[in-house]
Amino acid sequence: MTATSAAELLDYDDVVARFEPVMGMEVHVELSTATKMFCGCANAFGAEPNTQVCPVCLGLPGSLPVLNQQAVESAIRIGLALNCEIVPWCRFARKNYFYPDQPKNYQISQYDEPIAINGYLDVPLDDGSTWRVEIERAHMEEDTGKLTHLGSDTGRIAGATNSLADYNRAGVPLIEIVTRPIEGAGVKAPEIARAYVTALRDLLRALGVSDVRMDQGSMRCDANLSLKPIGQAEFGTRTETKNVNSLKSVEVAVRYEMRRQAAVLTSGGQVHQETRHFHEDGYTSPGRSKETAEDYRYFPEPDLEPVAPDAEFVEHLRQSLPELPWLRRNRIQQEWGISDEVMRDLVNNGAIDLVAATVEQGASSEAARAWWGNFLVQKANESGVELDALPITPAQVAAVVKLVDDGKLSNKLARQVVEGVLAGEGEPAQVMADRGLEVVRDDSALQAAVDEALAANPGIVEKIRGGKVQAAGAIVGAVMKATKGQADAARVRELVLAACS
């Protein structure tokens, strides 16, 4: 850890004893439309650089934007799901600034007239309580291009010798969701920040408007934070930690920034209004001075008509909303018969939708929970990715469960099959065959292994014959070891007892 070292940070308990944090979350969500916001270029992740561009998204003279209707519908659906008021009239504005990722030198966004306002999202916390986060606005805008900086130790523009611009992302439809100041969180502030982004991600995924892949940048979180002495009404100076790209990092970034700002204030210093970069080893570093609205010189976009959603159409979209996550969880919890604690663990691990999808593919809820809530969570943590970013699908997990249920795999062998799927070796049945992992059930092969184990352990044989049936476990263990775990343990036990009778 560099920047403010760990030794210089104020202890977290001291921070919350002396200061009240005030947070504001800004989440940018790329919409899963077929084309970009204002042109017909493809909206697809991972294409070769600068192959999904045209005069509109490159800002060439004479090009004119045409609004993507699907993006507007997605924005309205998001607003409705967030309990927002959908305004009867809104319009776009030009946000003017100069930076290499913006070929037009302005971004088409919404400034003082967003499409959705005054909403809220009830967020479940780890202790079973709920925190209501108030939504100030949700507005439409276009994304910027992506810059790759070369020659810099940090991968950022400072110290770079060259910068490469990929404009495939320029013009991709975005929804920015902005909260009102979150006050009174106290010691729970970092948890609430993470829980809010988690709940928002789950909601957007349920709506089907975005794949919300934080690791790919389709959901990006900016965390605004200030501290004020307890009892003071006036807010402190805020910082904005940009582009925090995982749920865990949101919590870590807020906690670090609280401790850093507290250390600055208690030493007599001043917190500067600035953007800050989050580093994966858990600290933030200064970015640039934070601009104000005046710096961007907003004015109405002259090339686009205002958007006036028809009330009947808005109501149609409201009625077509899918089952929302909190309603779905209540239903699932009752159907599966699981406790509040188990449900919270599944939600916090990001496993609930994956478990449900695995059950829909034919697995039992118990087996699906065991895989996604334990073994695969461990694999995700080892890989440093979100659970849904692992290269395995609910259908593949369900296929592994079926192989176990059919007696073709033991639980131990099944873990090896899943590891093979994660390594890209193919479907579960193929991995099982290629690795030779299928359970051995042929009596002749098993009998030979049993006879060998019995011959090597005459003392245990005498114990079994003397009535100590539990001693058969040692022979079963020897057979399992000899067959590398592939023997059918239940059948081996039957053969052992039969041989010793």
Swiss-Prot record:
GO terms for MF: asparaginyl-tRNA synthase (glutamine-hydrolyzing) activity; ATP binding; glutaminyl-tRNA synthase (glutamine-hydrolyzing) activity
Top enzyme class: ligase
Pfam families attached to this UniProt entry: GatB_N, GatB_Yqey
Catalytic activity reported: L-glutamyl-tRNA(Gln) + L-glutamine + ATP + H2O = L-glutaminyl-tRNA(Gln) + L-glutamate + ADP + phosphate + H(+); L-aspartyl-tRNA(Asn) + L-glutamine + ATP + H2O = L-asparaginyl-tRNA(Asn) + L-glutamate + ADP + phosphate + 2 H(+)
Record bears the keyword Glycosyltransferase: no
Domain of life: Bacteria
PROSITE patterns found in the cross-reference section: GATB
Record key words, sorted: ATP-binding, Ligase, Nucleotide-binding, Protein biosynthesis
EC number per UniProt: 6.3.5.-
Coiled coil: none
GO terms under biological process: glutaminyl-tRNAGln biosynthesis via transamidation; translation
Family the UniProt entry places it in: Belongs to the GatB/GatE family. GatB subfamily.
Record text on subunit structure and interactions: Heterotrimer of A, B and C subunits.
Functional summary from the UniProt entry: Allows the formation of correctly charged Asn-tRNA(Asn) or Gln-tRNA(Gln) through the transamidation of misacylated Asp-tRNA(Asn) or Glu-tRNA(Gln) in organisms which lack either or both of asparaginyl-tRNA or glutaminyl-tRNA synthetases. The reaction takes place in the presence of glutamine and ATP through an activated phospho-Asp-tRNA(Asn) or phospho-Glu-tRNA(Gln).
PANTHER family attached to this UniProt entry: GLUTAMYL-TRNA GLN AMIDOTRANSFERASE SUBUNIT B MITOCHONDRIAL AND PROKARYOTIC PET112-RELATED (PTHR11659), GLUTAMYL-TRNA(GLN) AMIDOTRANSFERASE SUBUNIT B, MITOCHONDRIAL (PTHR11659:SF0)
Protein name as it appears in the record: Aspartyl/glutamyl-tRNA(Asn/Gln) amidotransferase subunit B
Source organism of the structure: Mycobacterium sp. (strain KMS)
Classification lineage: Bacteria, Bacillati, Actinomycetota, Actinomycetes, Mycobacteriales
